[in-house]
Amino acid sequence: MSALLVEIDKDQFQAEVLEAEGYVLVDYFSDGCVPCKALMPDVEELAAKYEGKVAFRKFNTSSARRLAISQKILGLPTITLYKGGQKVEEVTKDDATRENIDAMIAKHVG
Protein backbone atom coordinates (compact mmCIF):
# COMPACT_ATOMS: atom_id res chain seq x y z
CA MET A 1 0.00 0.00 0.00
CA SER A 2 2.83 2.41 0.76
CA ALA A 3 3.66 2.56 -2.95
CA LEU A 4 0.92 5.21 -3.19
CA LEU A 5 2.58 7.37 -0.52
CA VAL A 6 5.90 8.17 -2.17
CA GLU A 7 8.78 9.66 -0.20
CA ILE A 8 10.48 12.56 -1.95
CA ASP A 9 13.59 14.55 -1.06
CA LYS A 10 14.46 18.21 -1.43
CA ASP A 11 15.80 17.68 -4.96
CA GLN A 12 12.47 16.21 -6.09
CA PHE A 13 10.21 18.67 -4.25
CA GLN A 14 10.10 21.31 -6.99
CA ALA A 15 9.03 18.87 -9.72
CA GLU A 16 6.84 16.60 -7.55
CA VAL A 17 4.96 19.35 -5.69
CA LEU A 18 5.51 22.90 -6.91
CA GLU A 19 5.44 22.10 -10.63
CA ALA A 20 2.85 19.33 -10.42
CA GLU A 21 -0.52 19.58 -12.12
CA GLY A 22 -3.58 18.87 -10.03
CA TYR A 23 -3.67 17.98 -6.36
CA VAL A 24 -0.66 16.86 -4.33
CA LEU A 25 -0.83 16.09 -0.62
CA VAL A 26 2.44 16.30 1.30
CA ASP A 27 2.89 14.58 4.65
CA TYR A 28 5.72 16.47 6.37
CA PHE A 29 7.41 14.39 9.07
CA SER A 30 10.74 13.99 10.85
CA ASP A 31 12.77 11.07 12.16
CA GLY A 32 11.99 11.84 15.80
CA CYS A 33 8.29 12.68 15.41
CA VAL A 34 6.29 9.91 17.10
CA PRO A 35 2.85 11.37 16.15
CA CYS A 36 4.05 11.55 12.53
CA LYS A 37 4.86 7.85 12.49
CA ALA A 38 1.53 7.02 14.16
CA LEU A 39 -0.35 8.98 11.49
CA MET A 40 1.47 7.45 8.49
CA PRO A 41 -0.77 4.32 8.13
CA ASP A 42 -3.86 6.56 8.04
CA VAL A 43 -2.28 8.70 5.33
CA GLU A 44 -1.45 5.53 3.37
CA GLU A 45 -5.11 4.45 3.58
CA LEU A 46 -6.23 7.87 2.35
CA ALA A 47 -3.74 7.59 -0.52
CA ALA A 48 -5.55 4.43 -1.60
CA LYS A 49 -8.96 6.07 -1.17
CA TYR A 50 -8.03 9.06 -3.35
CA GLU A 51 -5.85 7.20 -5.84
CA GLY A 52 -6.06 8.88 -9.24
CA LYS A 53 -7.40 12.13 -7.75
CA VAL A 54 -4.59 13.22 -5.44
CA ALA A 55 -0.87 12.42 -5.56
CA PHE A 56 0.41 11.58 -2.06
CA ARG A 57 3.98 12.42 -1.09
CA LYS A 58 5.84 12.31 2.21
CA PHE A 59 8.74 14.58 3.01
CA ASN A 60 11.28 14.14 5.82
CA THR A 61 12.08 17.59 7.19
CA SER A 62 15.03 16.25 9.24
CA SER A 63 17.37 16.48 6.26
CA ALA A 64 15.81 19.55 4.62
CA ARG A 65 15.01 22.13 7.27
CA ARG A 66 15.45 25.07 4.88
CA LEU A 67 12.85 23.71 2.51
CA ALA A 68 10.46 23.06 5.40
CA ILE A 69 10.90 26.64 6.60
CA SER A 70 10.39 27.97 3.06
CA GLN A 71 7.04 26.14 3.01
CA LYS A 72 6.23 27.59 6.46
CA ILE A 73 6.15 24.19 8.12
CA LEU A 74 6.35 25.21 11.77
CA GLY A 75 5.13 22.08 13.57
CA LEU A 76 4.85 18.39 12.89
CA PRO A 77 3.04 16.50 11.68
CA THR A 78 1.83 18.87 8.98
CA ILE A 79 -0.30 17.62 6.11
CA THR A 80 -0.53 20.14 3.27
CA LEU A 81 -2.72 20.01 0.18
CA TYR A 82 -1.38 21.75 -2.93
CA LYS A 83 -3.15 22.40 -6.22
CA GLY A 84 -1.11 23.42 -9.24
CA GLY A 85 1.87 24.05 -6.97
CA GLN A 86 -0.01 26.39 -4.63
CA LYS A 87 -0.77 25.56 -1.00
CA VAL A 88 -4.57 25.44 -0.61
CA GLU A 89 -5.00 24.12 2.93
CA GLU A 90 -3.18 22.29 5.69
CA VAL A 91 -3.73 20.60 9.02
CA THR A 92 -1.01 20.46 11.63
CA LYS A 93 -0.07 18.99 14.99
CA ASP A 94 -3.13 17.91 17.02
CA ASP A 95 -5.49 18.76 14.13
CA ALA A 96 -3.65 16.31 11.86
CA THR A 97 -6.07 13.40 12.28
CA ARG A 98 -7.32 10.96 9.67
CA GLU A 99 -10.79 12.52 9.88
CA ASN A 100 -9.53 16.09 9.41
CA ILE A 101 -7.22 15.11 6.55
CA ASP A 102 -10.04 13.23 4.82
CA ALA A 103 -12.41 16.20 5.28
CA MET A 104 -9.80 18.63 3.91
CA ILE A 105 -9.25 16.52 0.79
CA ALA A 106 -12.98 15.93 0.25
CA LYS A 107 -13.69 19.66 0.52
CA HIS A 108 -11.34 20.45 -2.36
CA VAL A 109 -11.38 17.29 -4.45
CA GLY A 110 -14.87 15.94 -3.81
UniProtKB/Swiss-Prot annotation:
Under the heading InterPro entries, the entry gives: Thioredoxin, Thioredoxin-like_sf, Thioredoxin_CS, Thioredoxin_domain
The job of this chain, per UniProt, is described as:
Participates in various redox reactions through the reversible oxidation of its active center dithiol to a disulfide and catalyzes dithiol-disulfide exchange reactions.
**Stated name of the protein:** Thioredoxin
Gene expressing this chain: trxA
Disulfide bond residue pairs: C33-C36
Q: Which family does it belong to?
A: Belongs to the thioredoxin family.
Q: What high-level taxonomic lineage is stated for the organism? A: Bacteria, Bacillati, Bacillota, Clostridia, Peptostreptococcales
**Example GO molecular function:** protein-disulfide reductase activity
Q: Which UniProt keywords apply?
A: Disulfide bond, Electron transport, Redox-active center, Transport
| GO cellular component labels | cytoplasm
Please state every residue range assigned to the domain named Thioredoxin. Answer: 2-110
Extract the Gene3D superfamilies matched here: Glutaredoxin
* Species for this entry: Peptoclostridium acidaminophilum (Eubacterium acidaminophilum)
